[in-house]
From Swiss-Prot:
It is found in: Nucleus, Nucleolus. Forms a heterodimer with slx1. GO terms for cellular component: nucleus; rDNA protrusion; Slx1-Slx4 complex. InterPro entries: Structure-sp_endonuc_su_Slx4. The keyword Lipoprotein does not apply. This is Structure-specific endonuclease subunit slx4. It comes from Schizosaccharomyces pombe (strain 972 / ATCC 24843).
Length: 419
């Protein structure tokens, strides 16, 4: 490959949006290209990802190189880490090639003609320039970590494949002090990655619930803070939970106490009514006869000369009033059974009459002699007694009243001794 063809990695965010444009490079140079191609398909988190674009331009004017970490964060040359000479490994220099296509097979098996033919000296010179850049260690750590957090929080869900590999990839780039700047959230993710391969939890659900139900904010915050993914002390969370439980139980106790007090007041009123009734019965004996007569007449009873009968009448009236008032208070008011039974009997009688009329009509129409049917068509009178006997011979026993109602319904002329 000529020296005019160069390698450039753009810093625009559109370059890293498509998965087909991302390539994973195994850091081995001194091997056959076929062996490199066979081992080139690796996990995204285990090595750097570099976007290579070839074009014909001045080779000396292009000194820009961008590394891409496992989560898709771009860092320019002036933001990269200052790698120490002890940590810099000349054997693990990446094999750079510039074969790009929409097809995945083209990416995994690049053409040898398009592969970049740069020796170790050129790569060492580029890495030495990156190494000599000042004040880039902390810049890379903060930019790599915080931009990752921003991209994740904007999508609403935090998803990462094996966070412990993310830490390894950062250490390959020289980020050994990431432990100091890492929040407890990433620590929890790294610890949970040992048991589960994928870690996923929602960030925006709490905000949505608080917007829908503002009154439930305190309970939501207490429950969310008790999760292992969020920051805080477990003891304080338990304390908040117990406080919420105490508040709930106190409110519930107050409601129950109010209902009990109301029920007690209701029972007191009933007891007072019973005591008043008993006191009235005791006072009836001391009432004069004229007053007892007035009370009995007020209830609609006839007056009597004997005081004992008047007392019994008044007592029975008072007992009836007390029982009725208690049944109303308890919701056991006596239903009007006689109305229900009467309506049921009426409906049953109507059904019987209609069924009997239908049976008579079927027998008349299906008879072989057609004597009754001919009389009906010629408007000749039918003897009711003879018609009743004729129906009995057809296995239909019907009373005279039902026969008369059938004749009245269908306009059949009748004759008989009942006139």
């Amino acid at each position: 490959m000529s020296a005019e063809e160069y390698i450039e990695v753009s810093s625009s965010p559109d370059i890293f949006t498509d998965d087909d444009d991302m390539i994973t490079i195994e850091p081995e140079l001194n091997k056959n290209p076929k062996d490199c191609n066979s081992k080139r398909k690796r996990s995204v988190t285990e090595c750097c990802e570099i976007r290579l674009i070839t074009s014909k331009c001045d080779f000396e004017s292009t000194q820009q190189l961008v590394h891409h970490n496992c989560t898709g964060h771009k860092v320019h040359e002036h933001n990269l880490n200052a790698v120490d000479e002890e940590d810099f490994d000349t054997e693990n220099l990446p094999l750079l090639f510039s074969s790009f296509s929409d097809n995945e097979s083209d990416i995994l098996e690049p053409d040898l003609n398009t592969r970049v033919a740069e020796d170790n000296d050129v790569l060492l010179s580029r890495y030495s320039k990156i190494k000599n850049s000042a004040s880039c260690r902390n810049t890379f750590e903060h930019s790599a970590y915080h931009s990752n957090r921003e991209e994740i929080s904007s999508s609403g869900f935090y998803y990462h494949r094996k966070p412990q590999l993310f830490e390894k990839s950062l250490e390959k780039l020289g980020n050994k002090s990431i432990e100091a700047n890492r929040s407890p959230l990433i620590k929890e993710l790294c610890e949970s990655a040992n048991s589960t391969e994928n870690v996923c939890f929602s960030v925006s659900t709490v905000d949505e619930i608080q917007q829908r139900h503002p009154s439930a904010g305190h309970s939501i915050d207490s429950t969310c803070q008790s999760n292992s993914f969020l920051e805080g002390d477990s003891a304080t969370h338990k304390k908040k939970k117990t406080d919420n439980i105490k508040e709930f139980t106190s409110c519930e106790f107050n409601d129950r106490s109010r209902t009990l007090l109301n029920y007690a007041g209701y029972m007191d009123t009933n007891k007072n009514a019973d005591n008043e009734a008993k006191s009235l019965k005791e006072k009836l004996e001391n009432f004069p006869v004229e007053k007892l007569r007035a009370i009995a007449e007020s209830y609609g009873f006839k007056s009597s000369d004997s005081k004992a009968t008047l007392i019994k009448i008044v007592e029975s009236c008072l007992d009836a009033i007390d029982s009725r008032s208690q049944s109303k208070k308890l919701g056991k008011e006596t239903p009007h059974d006689y109305l229900i039974t009467s309506t049921k009997t009426v409906l049953e009688f109507d059904d019987i009459v209609t069924q009997t009329h239908r049976a008579i009509s079927q027998v008349v129409k299906q008879a072989k002699d057609n004597s009754v049917w001919i009389k009906i068509l010629t408007y000749s009178a039918i003897d009711v007694e003879e018609f009743q006997l004729w129906l009995k011979r057809k296995n239909l026993n019907v009373s005279l009243d039902l026969i008369k109602s059938w004749c009245d319904k269908y306009g059949v002329l009748m004759k008989g001794s009942w006139h």
